[in-house]
């Protein structure tokens, strides 16, 4: 197959395989728009307009996943654009939540709404707080009041989740220590507010290391008195208590992880890419066991579901939209770039086409599908 890109944007053709093992041809194209303030509100109420970056200003395709910090140990900025197929359109928001008017506040709402052909397809609200913690008292763990703050990055590190690690010996320190306990929250190992029961049982007489849910605590501890709490939660599902989970076994497969997750107190709230190895995304990958290795390798397992390639939270996945998708952000952009914290814009009605030219000379135009919208 010969591929020619005649658009002033970056595009690429590549081959992939479907579940039965058939070769499929994929074309990926990236269009990036710069948000610019509108001179005045139009009839649709848009505060900003989208300006296409093309030619020398066009942004290249992302060839690999990019992270906010250390690879595999921090939130994903954006994933590779070379997904073989996405059954739905991911709507992702990489943002910092700002307190109204830039004035420090203990908590405030943030909201994302998306409209496809005038129909609202996403309405997601978050509650954002300043730094807060669970403190240990004679009646158990209590959630403290948040400190006022101006801004909080909307990342999984600030949401519900966590990691519980305990070293075998007092001398063990850091990631290289031998671990007696090494458990993660299957829905978000980067977060806070989740601990495995054995962490609290054993950390009073062992060395506590590299625990994201207790990242402010030093090595050997006689007592744990404070654990950071989530700063981002669903607007209608407030977090009120420390989630002490129990993982009765290690080395669980994806199905077993899903069963354990059903007993968690809540789910992480966020707007960005869900980790490939997290529940519920992992469950779509399929079963990679000895049977697969003997009968299917290197192809997908028979239970592979292409929804695995959709990286947005489930409530941010929509049907492939029509041109002209509109979106609104509340308290998710710098106040000086908004109208009282509010921002609204719409994508231009651009349509990307692939013209298939067969050996016979016949040309068949195919309209490309919008499978990812990243608001950054």
Locate the predicted segments by residue.
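Extended intrinsically disordered or low-complexity segments
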Residues: 2-376
